A protein has these predicted regions:
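Short, low-complexity disordered leader/linker segments with a strong preference
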Residues: 1-32
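Acidic, polar ligand-binding/catalytic clefts
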Residues: 75, 79, 84-152, 224-230
Length: 278
C-alpha cells in the first residue's frame, strides 16, 4: 500500500512540475521581419565581407553582410515592430517573385513603384531624402563627356539593367544607341568604366557615389524639366498586396522620420561607402 501511495505522490509532483515549467515558455517569440535586397546598388544597398556596427548578416550567404540606406530604413521599421531583421540577398529579377512566394515579407532594395510593379505588389510611400532624379554617368574619355542635354547623346552607346527604367529610359535620349541590357548594376558600372559604352542612366545619388569613387567617371545632371520623365513616385518598400498591416507600419515609420533625419542617415551611409572605397 505504501508503495502505491509513494507512486501516486510522485505522479502528482511530476504533473505539478510539468505545469510550472510549461509556463516558462509562454513568452511570445520575437517577430522576424524578412527583407530581400539586391546588394548591388550603392548607396542604397551593397555587400560587405566583414561585420560592422551598421551592416547586417545575409541569412542566405555565409560570411557576407549588407549595408546601405535601404538597410538603415528597414532597421527603423524592424525596431518599431520590436522585430529581428533578417536580410536575404536576392537577384533583382527574383525580388518580386520571392515576395509572392512568401520567402520574404518586404523588399527594401532601391525599388521604384512603377505601374507594372504595382500590379504585382503594394508599395509604401517613398523613403528617399529627395524625389528620385535620373542622371547620366559617362566615361571621361567618351566624346560625350561634355554633354549637357538629352539631345547631346545622339550616337552614344548606353546599356542598363534588364527589366528596369535604367534601361528603358535610354529611349528618351534622341539618337542614343541602346546596347544589350546587362543582368545587374555592377555590370552597368563595369561597362562604363571600361569604355565598352559611353554612359549609363542612373539614379542621382548612385551617380554621385560612382563619380566620387571612380576617377574616370563623370556625372551629368540635367536642369529641372529638361531631364528624364520617370513616371513613378520614387524608391519605396514593396510588400504583398494583402499585407496591409505591414504596409501601414512601414508608412508610419517613414512619415515619422523627418527629411532631416533621413538626410543624416544618407550622409552617414555615403560616408561609409567612400571610406570603404578609399
Amino acid at each position: 500500500m505504501k508503495k502505491y501511495i509513494l507512486l501516486l505522490v510522485l505522479a502528482v509532483c511530476a504533473c505539478v512540475f510539468a505545469y510550472v515549467n510549461s509556463g516558462k515558455d509562454e513568452t511570445p517569440a520575437k517577430p522576424v521581419l524578412r527583407i530581400g535586397v539586391e546588394c548591388d546598388y550603392a548607396p542604397n544597398n551593397w555587400e560587405e565581407k566583414r561585420p560592422s556596427a551598421f551592416n547586417l548578416p545575409l541569412s542566405n550567404q555565409e560570411g557576407a553582410y549588407a549595408d546601405g540606406y535601404d538597410l538603415q530604413i528597414a532597421k527603423l521599421v524592424a525596431d518599431d515592430m520590436g522585430a529581428t531583421l533578417e536580410v536575404r540577398k536576392i537577384a533583382w529579377n527574383d525580388l518580386l517573385p520571392a515576395l509572392q512566394r512568401g520567402e520574404i515579407d518586404a523588399i527594401f532594395s532601391g525599388m521604384l513603384d512603377t505601374e507594372e510593379r504595382r500590379r504585382q505588389a503594394a508599395f509604401s510611400d517613398p523613403y528617399e531624402v529627395t524625389a528620385t532624379e535620373y542622371s547620366v554617368v559617362v566615361n571621361t574619355s567618351s566624346p560625350y563627356a561634355n554633354a549637357k542635354k538629352l539631345t547631346d547623346f545622339s550616337g552614344a552607346k548606353f546599356t542598363g539593367q534588364k527589366g528596369t527604367k535604367l534601361y528603358s529610359s535610354i529611349g528618351q535620349m534622341p539618337g542614343a544607341i541602346a546596347m544589350p541590357a546587362v543582368d545587374n548594376v555592377s555590370e552597368m558600372l563595369d561597362a562604363v568604366t571600361s569604355g565598352k559604352v559611353d554612359g549609363i542612366v542612373i539614379n542621382l545619388d548612385t551617380g554621385r557615389s560612382y563619380e566620387a569613387t571612380h576617377s574616370n567617371l563623370k556625372l551629368i545632371r540635367f536642369p529641372e524639366n529638361e531631364g528624364f520623365v520617370i513616371g513613378f513616385s520614387g524608391i519605396c518598400a514593396g510588400v504583398r498586396k494583402n499585407d496591409t498591416e505591414l504596409l501601414n507600419r512601414i508608412n508610419m515609420v517613414i512619415e515619422r522620420t523627418t527629411k532631416n533625419e533621413r538626410q543624416k542617415i544618407m550622409d552617414a551611409t555615403v560616408s561609409r561607402l567612400l571610406k570603404n572605397a578609399s
